[in-house]
From Swiss-Prot:
Residues that hold UDP-alpha-D-glucuronate according to the record: Y442, D470, Q518, L519, D520, S521, H582, A604, V605
Cross-referenced Gene3D superfamilies: Spore Coat Polysaccharide Biosynthesis Protein SpsA, Chain A
Biological source species: Pasteurella multocida (strain Pm70)
Name under which the protein is recorded: Chondroitin synthase
Residues involved in UDP-N-acetyl-alpha-D-galactosamine binding: P158, R162, D189, Y218, R224, D240, C241, E362, D363
One protein family per Pfam: Glycos_transf_2
High-level lineage: Bacteria, Pseudomonadati, Pseudomonadota, Gammaproteobacteria, Pasteurellales
Keywords: Cell membrane, Glycosyltransferase, Manganese, Membrane, Metal-binding, Multifunctional enzyme, Repeat, Transferase
Amino acid sequence: MNTLSQAIKAYNSNDYELALKLFEKSAETYGRKIVEFQIIKCKEKLSTNSYVSEDKKNSVCDSSLDIATQLLLSNVKKLTLSESEKNSLKNKWKSITGKKSENAEIRKVELVPKDFPKDLVLAPLPDHVNDFTWYKNRKKSLGIKPVNKNIGLSIIIPTFNRSRILDITLACLVNQKTNYPFEVVVADDGSKENLLTIVQKYEQKLDIKYVRQKDYGYQLCAVRNLGLRTAKYDFVSILDCDMAPQQLWVHSYLTELLEDNDIVLIGPRKYVDTHNITAEQFLNDPYLIESLPETATNNNPSITSKGNISLDWRLEHFKKTDNLRLCDSPFRYFSCGNVAFSKEWLNKVGWFDEEFNHWGGEDVEFGYRLFAKGCFFRVIDGGMAYHQEPPGKENETDREAGKSITLKIVKEKVPYIYRKLLPIEDSHIHRIPLVSIYIPAYNCANYIQRCVDSALNQTVVDLEVCICNDGSTDNTLEVINKLYGNNPRVRIMSKPNGGIASASNAAVSFAKGYYIGQLDSDDYLEPDAVELCLKEFLKDKTLACVYTTNRNVNPDGSLIANGYNWPEFSREKLTTAMIAHHFRMFTIRAWHLTDGFNEKIENAVDYDMFLKLSEVGKFKHLNKICYNRVLHGDNTSIKNLDTQKKNHFVVVNQSLNRQRVSNYNYDEFDNLDESRKYIFNKTADYQEEIDILKDIKIVQRKDAKVAISIFYPNRLDGLVKKLNNIIEYNKNVLIIVLHIDKNHLTSDIKKEILEFHNKNQINILLNNDVSYYTNNRLIKTKAHLSNMNKLRQLNLNLEYIIFDNHDSLFIKNDSYNHIKKYDIGMNFSSLTNDWINKINAHSPFKNLIKKYFNDNDLKTINMKGASQGMFIKYTLAHDIATIMKEVITLCQSTDSVPEYNTEDIWFQFALLILEKKTGHVFNKTSTLTYMPWERKLQWTNEQIESAKRGENIPVNKFIINSITL
């Protein structure tokens, strides 16, 4: 291994003294500029005195080690034990870890507190751990935008010989269609062939560099790192020399990366044979690479075949997981022959691990570090590249043999997914543990041994303990070093005092595990605490946090009382009270998706942290008493109650603000310091957000006599496009009433609506009177009735109201001349058996039908039809609404909830009642909406254009459904 590789290995192992010496030595060989950044980082680490040199742990004394550590070292011959000694230790360990956590008392509770506002909607959670769509929307909501200084793509092409194939790949890069700048860095791993000649051939066609290292054998990671250090742009791509990119490859990668620089992009691949084609042919025909037939390969040990061609083995998984969005371990599909990402991630996770000096595994290990630090992975079709198969269909790398070597390294360094829970007899100390228990320690010399020992004496042994001494003024650090300084499962750091939040951030950052457990320095765990939580994580990879409950004990361990236990988790309850008590474990990935512990507050630090975690992933609560909370009078949780209370309400409101909940404040109910009674108060600007046109006078237009009522079910995407579509085809519209979820009413959308109003002089009324927590079978009907009530308050001179759909599209001009021929446009059809069964199960409505029609046979009554595109004379609409309100009141009085879509039947029912009461049969026709049998499919642009021309659309139809606007 060369000096630079040794330096990187030492740095990644936290041996910064050795790393600094080796980087200084590397500077003599490679030049100061190449390693200057690493030298600075080493000096920063050393100056903080926040680590313990690995040299101090070389000498292992078995007498000072916990039992599990002795057994683990013995399993791999690093500690010599006789068989009797080993059996004795096993029996002691089983005795120590044999105690099981007690069940906590469970009581029935409301999952959502009764006083939690119905219209307070918390931000959505991701569908899975790699939900890049959720993350992108979250950053947009928080106003987080990427800051790029040097936009462009640096393409790193590692190569060893294979000049002919490299020639073709460079030719395909010449053919790129993009306005973005890019450079090519050919990184040579000591080739015997003269690659410089190939590179010089393209100096006039590409911005190209050539860097080379001596042939030390298979050093793919080292040569990748060499190329990456040479890169000048903010974004980098790694492209194997045999991967020929399609023409929009650069453009596709950069377009996505500029939108989100916290994502790794992965390109799929196809296998082609180019050995009878020259680079000049590709230069002369940019489409040639994409036109080649797919072929078979013997290169990849994991290849999938279909007939006579080989397929990218990842394609099926890409399809199943929505391009990895729903994948629990996307780094396993991070094949570095064709990827792109922001260069700043190298500063966050480090470089490729140069210990991998055989084929395979290095990309998985690097990808895992990206994943653990909070990076997202996404496959894009625009990243397609064509794998050029060498003559004979095999290359010079012995891949199968290499994989057998590197897989062992992967299992040592990638605990998540690649690690199983094993009995202690079959376990050893891994270089990267599965679990880290972190302990912030300050002046706790009297308690720290019991605390640390409880973490080491867990039934799960794939575990480390990370202790951060936060500038203790007693002998805490001395005790820790004496007891655990030589323990390979304990890592110790020390820093100047900064408070519990600072120590927690330092300790979690110091931890190596994927699953992180929190333990206060004066408390201690039950032996199965980690195992109970870990099993939940392993069952459900979408969990961000698992927590148990605790008991309060005296310093001597005697019971005071069991701790407070809320038996079931809900985000709404956590928003009102800290229910996520010790013992708590979370994933390091989830933690990195937050900004960590808040070092600006002294109390409510944990509450703030777990509110943040609850915003990025699911929680699971276990009703087990796994944690012993020692009360000795100096606990931070029972001191400074006034500050605690203040910060309690501060952190909840900060959580609501992060989730863009702007209509409520979480306020204290009384002035008692020990009280956490609360009240949700509506914010002062709440009505201003909704009634954005309150200061704008209604614009009266002589020929405008139509109102349109629309219900938006959730997001307001495409709202302004919808408004423009309405007025383009309907010149007689006076006002549009939108029932919306105000949580999606952003300042940008409000601005667009105001601009629309000012430009077109069309009145817009926003309404949100109906709670979006209402049963979804009734909500749309209530929303339209509420819209009509808002209109009535304005006393407008209207002739008709149209009930439009948020995702429909007008396609023909002048619906007004059509609808004014009729009183009402509704669809009337017979009820299916499914509808009849649901109505019969809804006794209030069934009784009304019997009352007015004296007929139990619902098949004889035609009153079913989609409400989209329905229109009614304005005066009749209010009569119909009055009847419908009576139906709703009756349902509410009996607390009976319908199981059918009321908007598709209650309008028709009310009209039939009105005709029966008045004895007048109104002039009726069908709705304005055309909904073909394939209505659940989205309309294509071609279908829309065809519909605008009136092709295949009935002459009396003016709206089509459903459109993505």
